[in-house]
A protein has these predicted regions:
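Soluble "head" domains of membrane/secretory-pathway proteins
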Residues: 1-181
């Protein structure tokens, strides 16, 4: 994790003293989990402050524009005996793969109360959220098996740890160990 990509913070009090960059759509970001800041989470940034993020019927749109996606070969989960639909998506200069399970519902039944919850509308097809100032909307690349902003809300800027750029250890996909992002 590059802790300086988004700025330099004072230790202990976590105050940003030098702003360098802001998280961009498509970045893989490490942050302190909003519901328990003692835990670090890693997710992909899909919405930045001011964006309207819509995830309806498993289709992601940002500010009314669908995220460019292409279906590729299905992904086999070696530890479970099933396949997920796999897609390649592009956000700006970032291209990445994500998974969808065609049998999983788009509806999010157990979204909790969270700050700025009023910025989100939940319906049978999914969720639409307006990202507040100094907050980010993040999603996991394994969409139907990810607890992310759809469930627990936005990531405050103050919770950002840094930008992920190197895969240190991935036991489920050893070929990715040591690769750069």
């Amino acid at each position: 994790v590059n802790k300086f990509t988004y700025g330099i913070r004072l230790p202990v009090i976590n105050t940003k003293i030098i702003a360098i960059n802001s998280p961009q759509r498509g970045d893989v970001m490490v942050f302190r989990y909003p519901e328990d800041p003692s835990l670090d989470y890693i997710k992909r940034v899909v919405g930045v402050p001011g964006d309207t993020v819509s995830y309806q019927n498993k289709r992601l749109t940002i500010n009314g524009l669908p995220v460019e996606t292409t279906k590729v070969f299905d992904y086999h989960h070696p530890e479970r005996l099933y396949y997920s639909e796999q897609y390649v998506a592009r956000m700006g200069d970032v291209e990445y793969k994500y998974l969808n399970d065609s049998d999983a519902p788009a509806f999010i039944p157990d979204a909790t109360r969270f700050p700025f919850r009023e910025n989100c509308t939940y319906n049978a097809a999914g969720v639409i959220c307006k990202v507040p100032d100094r907050h980010y909307f993040v999603m996991g690349d394994n969409r139907d098996n990810s607890r992310d902003s759809r469930f627990w809300g936005f990531v405050p800027e103050r919770n950002i740890v840094g930008k992920a750029f190197f895969i240190w250890l991935n036991l489920s996909s050893p070929s990715r160990i040591g690769s750069f992002k």
